[in-house]
Amino acid sequence: MTPLDRAHLAAEDDGTDTARLTFFERLAEAELHLLLDDGDSRDGTITPRLFEIEGTRYALAFDLPDRLTDFAGAAATATLSGRRLATMLASENLGLGLNLEDAPSAQLLDPEALRWLNRTLAHQPEETEARIQEVSSPGDIPDALLTALDGKLGLAVGLARTGYLAGVAYEGGARGHILGFVDVVPGAEGDLARAVSEALVFSGLDAGQIDVTFLRAAHPLAATLARHGLRIDLPVPDAPATPTAPGTDAPPRLR
């Protein structure tokens, strides 16, 4: 059983918004195998095989190669992340037939569901400036948020050494939470900020807010966050490589 299977069954059994959000989070993170009409992908262009059901056209994708083979036999495929596929299909008003026919997660996702997922993933954090007055313990953090952060940052291999989640008070009286990343790879700041933003949304706490900052280990605030905050260690790459965040490469063009 795959992570998508487990997330789909949990959403069906639980029935809560949080469980459904978790399914869409797993879908965005999954590596999917898209069924193509042919093997021609020159110039970055691919042609998905489409099926029309009750007036809606669907592309078909599977989270395991064997599932695609069982459904379609030997066929041309393209492998891409769920978030990239959502972007592609939403732009063409296409739905997604996922893991048809016998998988626990088999279902049809209509174009509106993919547009919602694409809008959610396209959200960009806002950059602001504020002067910190006090750093404190983060207090009681909802388990759903901690789980979502663990899942998102678990994919950010090599993008930073560590992070600290703490309570914060700003000049002017505003209070909240801050997640400070230490020794971030240059250029990875936006990817990490988006990962935290998505963790909030997919935990069901999108009305909440976590401020994100990026520090060198020698910065005084890094030591303060280490004293008061909850430490979050990011995965270290197995071998030296240029780190990249998942799903950030440009999607191929549909034809």
Question: Language-model features: where?
Answer:
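An interfacial alpha-helical scaffold signature
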Residues: 1-255
